[in-house]
Amino acid sequence: MRMLRWLILSAFSVAGAVQAQGNQDSAAASASSASIGAPVLRTSPGLRVHRLPDEKIPAFMEADQISGDPDSEVTLTGNAQVRRVDGIIKGDRINYRRDTGDVDVQGSARMLRDGTLITGPSARLNVDTYSGEIQEPNFWIGASGGTAQARHADIFSKSQMRLSQVTYSGCPCPKPSWYIKADTVDLDFDENEGVARNGVLYFKDVPILASPYLTFPVKKERKSGFLMPTYGTTSNSGFDISLPYYFNLAPNYDLTLVPRYLSKRGAQLGGEFRYLGSGYRGVAIGTYLPDDNETGRDRWMYRTYHRQLLGNGFYTDWDIAGASDDNYFRDISELGLNTASTTYLPRRGRVGWSSTYWQTYAQVYKYQTLQDPDAPLAPPYDKVPELWLKGARYDWGGFDAEWVSTAVRFQRPLLNGRRLGPDGDRLQTYPTVSYPIVRPGWFLVPKVGVHYTQYRTDWYNRDWNRIGLSNYKRTESRTVPIMSLDAGMIFERDASLFGKAATQTLEPRLYYLRVPYRDQSALPVYDTTLADFSFDQAFQENIYTGGWDRIANANQLTAALTTRWLDANTGFERLSLSAAQRIYFQDQEVTLPAEQPRKNVRSDFLVGATAALTDTLTTDVAAQYNPYDNKWSRGMVSARWSPQRLTTVAVAYRYQRDPLPGISYQPQGQNQVSLAVQWPIHRRWYGVGRVDYSLRSEPATAAAAEQSPRVTQAIAGLEYKGDCCWVGRVVYQRYAVSAADTNTALFFQLELTGLGALGTDPISLLNRSIPGYQSVVPPTPTGTTFERYE
């Protein structure tokens, strides 16, 4: 018989308890979220929250037969269950003392709370204190997806229990690939901690790791403790192993310490501190290796980044890094991370302010230049300090107005005691006004501005600009008006591409630029270089990039034409073809020191194409062609084919012609082919690889003499996807660390789903090196307490 009166009473009582519990949890979540500056939902002040004590929470009972005194002891027989807002108990027969909260379950006991399910042949439990014991229990932990079997379980409270003779696994397969056996396991769900004593990790029934004391999280949340060790080997440092320890200090900041041993160099300690608050965030990392066995001196590096909102539009940030010596990143790079190419370490601090129409900041920006002895570099200028101001007002009666001003003090570090250039101050201001006319199918944008620059320079009695002067003026100024007109049209028509309906566009564009000549040969050059000619640069006001220490005279017209084929149903761009050329009506008279002025009346041709020939094959082409000597100045061709998941082939060719002998303001040439692959080999085996090969030979400049044909990077690896819950990886990497030297690395990884990974994680390396790479293990969605409902 069913007790209808109890059902109705309990239904109303449980609804009230759920509301009270939910409101309290929402308030707690709001407080937590507010501490890190996230948007939050807050409880209305008009709602009253009532938290019932555990012994007052009403119960709902159901069974095929119910007997006894409803105010003292009740016996439920057949499909019996006791439901409360905080948990569910089921069994074949349940004796329930309502006055004490004691529950005795006989036969097919099931207990569910917060997504954790416990089953066993029998159980004794107090529903008020949630304490008791259960024989031969089986556990399913909803928050993590883990399962466990034990000989006996003692339950001390809602959040704490002890299991004896335990087998635990986070693998959901019928026959788990890995599991942990332990004499006892203590679980604390509030602290998100499990402690296994005399634990042994088994993989394929083979013990691979043992410890008298192991800790692990019981929920998919952060927890203090040791992380999985990483290990590998490199030619520069030998065998490399580290054992990180993670400190979950608070919800909004944490610390990771990384003891590390390198067989050729010694012991190193590293650390990373991360923090996040309302209006600020940052990270600080560092490493220290005392008395390097290879060099005999201490080796270290650090980097700290911070950004903070100060209120009323003000903010501050810094990015400061340093290393003990030039070769630190070539000798002690992180496994799987090619940091050997790191050249400039920033040392910047800034304070700024921003409003609707104005932005400004003051900063000090310096660098540490890590020199390669085989290819020394001139260190860039330090800005000590720089003041920057920008005002902008758009659609102001149809006009767009901008004003940009900077004031900088430049100082150049010495290189081996030698001075490499002048020092000085530079003041610039550049107001502009434009009137964009944008209509369906066409646009016209006239623009005018005046660029003013004032210099105060310490020349140190040297002819840095190579113009034959022995006595440069200490102060100089320059005023240059700049005028441009940008116009374009867009035509559309119905068309077809590869037999499919498409919309074709035709987009001609003209850009006229007029800049009168100003003699700038006696002005210093601090942070200005010749820009690469490209589709974007063809529509810019200056052929130089950076701080505009040179503004080229111009009387020129850029003509460009683009046509696209768009899928008629989705709008997806299937094919795009572009071409552009600049026509000069005036010779170039403004140059960088030692730069040869242009005399041609036409620029190189720019051509480009992108095509998604099918849903699995894409190609890109970009090239620059010199019509005067009928040679390619630069080019890039790439293609990627991804016919299915975990299958991709990417090939690319990059070329850039060498500059003429003695020209240092243009980049060095490049002639390189790259091939990257992820491919299924056989059943569960997958191959990954990449090779970058430089085809350079007979270099045109002495600076490129070391750039003979060679492999600049090679990656080869195998991945094996196990039958359930595990993946094995082995990856080999060889890469250039300088103009003449290379480093090799070999690392292994065993990834156990639900636990972590042993060894060095190569995923970031593979993601960066193989376009379209996909992990053989798809991401697992995070479990919740609502994974199971009964």
Curated annotation (Swiss-Prot):
Keywords: Cell outer membrane, Membrane, Signal. Belongs to the LptD family. Residues 1-20 form the signal peptide. One of its GO terms (biological process) is Gram-negative-bacterium-type cell outer membrane assembly. Together with LptE, is involved in the assembly of lipopolysaccharide (LPS) at the surface of the outer membrane. This is LPS-assembly protein LptD. It comes from Bordetella parapertussis (strain 12822 / ATCC BAA-587 / NCTC 13253). The keyword Ribosomal protein does not apply. Component of the lipopolysaccharide transport and assembly complex. Interacts with LptE and LptA.
